[in-house]
């Protein structure tokens, strides 16, 4: 229960952080100067929010369930959890939120690069989008735990 509370706090806090839209072909964002309050040796976390195309959220869930999860494991993208909003806000009915963990920022960049280059991912993405794209927008926040965070 304590771990779940920590994860939910992480997700809630991250919603207060400014988010940037990710582009599949964009270089990694520049890093901020390290804060003294960041935990030394913390893993790198990534909060991702997907805004599904209208009417495509269940197809997006199916792609994660049937293809993406296996490929995440293959390429070292450790899933902390997936969430769906329970309060009605503009666009929330098409939203999927998840958190990934990596040993380091460099490991994150390599894992995503390898994942996107994987022919199995490319085939799954192409097949799942044969009737139109599934995702309108992706927001991504790359984070490190603070020194007082129960999850590192």
Where are these predicted regions, by residue range?
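Positively charged n-region of N-terminal signal peptides that target proteins for export
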Residues: 1-4
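Bacterial N-terminal signal peptides
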Residues: 7-18
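Signal peptide cleavage region of secreted peptide precursors
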Residues: 19-23
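An amphipathic, aromatic/His-enriched active-site/gating alpha helix that lines ligand/cofactor pockets
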Residues: 24-41, 62-80, 88, 92, ...
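Active-site-flanking beta-strand signature of metal-NTP-handling nucleotidyl enzymes
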Residues: 45-49, 97
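Short, surface-exposed ligand-recognition loops at beta-strand->loop->(often short) alpha-helix junctions
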Residues: 52-61
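Short, low-complexity, Pro/Ser/Thr/Gly-rich segments in the mature regions of secreted, periplasmic
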Residues: 144-151
């Amino acid at each position: 229960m304590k771990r779940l509370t920590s994860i939910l706090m992480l997700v809630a806090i991250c919603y207060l952080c400014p988010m940037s839209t990710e582009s599949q072909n964009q270089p990694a964002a520049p890093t901020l100067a390290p804060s003294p309050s960041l935990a030394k040796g913390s893993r790198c976390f990534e909060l991702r929010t997907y805004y599904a195309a209208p009417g495509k959220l269940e197809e997006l869930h199916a792609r994660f369930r049937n293809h993406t999860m296996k490929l995440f494991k293959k390429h070292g993208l450790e899933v902390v959890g997936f969430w769906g909003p329970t309060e009605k806000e503009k666009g929330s009915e098409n939203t999927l939120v998840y958190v990934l963990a990596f040993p380091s920022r460099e490991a994150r960049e390599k894992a995503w690069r390898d994942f996107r280059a994987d022919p199995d991912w490319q085939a799954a993405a192409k097949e799942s989008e044969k009737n139109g794209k599934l995702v309108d927008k992706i927001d991504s926040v790359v984070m490190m735990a603070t020194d007082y965070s129960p999850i590192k």
